[in-house]
A protein has these predicted regions:
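Transmembrane beta-strands of outer-membrane beta-barrel pores
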Residues: 71-77, 97-99, 106-110, 127, ...
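Transmembrane beta-strands of outer-membrane beta-barrel proteins
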Residues: 65-69, 91, 100-104, 121, ...
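Outer-membrane beta-barrel "beta-signal"
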Residues: 195-199, 245-250, 276-281, 291-308
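Short loop/turn motifs that connect adjacent beta-strands in outer-membrane beta-barrel proteins
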Residues: 53-64, 113, 128-133, 149, ...
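Residues that define the transmembrane beta-barrel architecture of outer-membrane proteins
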Residues: 61-63, 85-89, 115-119, 132, ...
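Outer-membrane beta-barrel biogenesis signature
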Residues: 26-67, 77-80, 200
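Solvent-exposed loop segments that connect transmembrane elements
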Residues: 223-232, 263-291
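Detector for outer-membrane/organellar transmembrane beta-barrel domains
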Residues: 154-234, 256
Length: 308
């Protein structure tokens, strides 16, 4: 049976680590290297991974706000596309107070259940312990306007940490868990690690920051609900590598992404409505031998601005 889980495992857009180099208003510590995003969540980089101009003298101080908006040539989440390899737009807002934060994002998607958009709501705490920047939180994913009878909303908890080896080099690791990915009855677990290197600023034009980064993640699952076949979703590894350019509030990320999913398992995992026959037949989860290109090698360009 085909699983409409594709959104759920949206692709690892892990646009991780947008280096904080280009923001004159930021402190020397922040300019060194922004946290690497190993969450794989969202059509935009996570707030703590995106450099931008600072909203100074906020009347709500010490309550801080951030805003991000942009577009991308594809929406890759944990290695698979959530936009059928079509361009997307997205925006995000976040409020933080001391260690605590809450935020929301909206992004265009193209999924089997035809939702109007992907909305995410998240919150958590970001403490610093032993020079490690931690992030413990939860995310609720909502897909309004789905086809009649479909409901793939779900929630996920996560923990991740970022550590600076030097002012220019950061490593990160994260773990996420959902009791029912895409409301399909199957639990999901996700683990990832990443590395980022900021190029020396003396080698670059004024106000330009450049970083190289990469992430490797592993996604595995339990059995789906009996109504969806009761079989386990295919576990897989994904990876990406790219370069991020930053100048003040503007950011450009160019990234290569791929997974080790076969085209047949890609269909099983995503439920791609455009899948075609011609692959290996599996009488349990793919009796027609359908194949999908939603999980293969992809080049993604992403442009956005960030106000922090």
């Amino acid at each position: 049976m085909r699983i409409m889980l594709q959104r759920f495992l949206p692709s690892l857009k892990i646009v991780l680590l947008l280096l904080a180099a280009a923001t004159p208003a930021r402190s020397a510590e922040n300019n060194a290297s922004a946290p690497l995003d190993v969450s794989g969540r969202g059509a935009l980089p996570s707030n703590d991974a995106a450099p931008g101009a600072t909203w100074k003298d906020s009347p709500f101080s010490p309550l801080d706000f951030s805003l991000r908006a942009g577009l991308a040539s594809d929406y890759i989440y944990r290695g698979t596309t959530l936009s059928a390899h079509q361009p997307v737009v997205g925006a995000a807002v976040e409020a933080s107070f001391s260690l605590f934060y809450a935020g929301a994002t909206a992004a265009s998607v193209k999924l089997p259940t035809n939702p109007a958009a992907e909305l995410t709501f998240n919150g958590g705490i970001r403490p610093k312990i032993w020079d490690i920047d931690f992030d413990f939180g939860w995310t609720y994913l909502q897909y309004p306007g789905e086809a009649e009878g479909a409901s793939t909303d779900y929630w996920e908890t996560f923990a991740r940490g970022n550590y600076k080896l030097t002012d220019a080099v950061s490593i990160a690791a994260g773990f996420a868990y959902s009791p029912s990915i895409s409301n399909a009855g199957a639990w999901s677990k996700y683990a990832a690690t990443g590395l980022s290197v900021e190029l020396p600023r003396e080698l670059l034009p004024n106000d330009i920051g450049v970083s190289l980064s990469g992430v490797v993640g592993y996604f595995w699952f339990g059995n789906q609900a009996p109504a969806l076949g009761g079989f386990p979703l295919p576990a897989y590894t994904h990876w990406n590598a790219g370069v991020t350019f930053s100048r003040k509030m503007f950011n450009l990320d160019l990234r290569y992404s791929n997974t080790n999913l076969s085209k047949e398992d890609c269909f099983v995992f995503t439920g791609d409505p455009g899948a075609v026959p011609g692959g290996r037949i599996n009488p349990i989860n793919n009796p027609d031998g359908l194949v999908s290109n939603w999980c293969g090698p992809t080049l993604v360009a992403k442009l956005w601005f960030a106000l922090n």
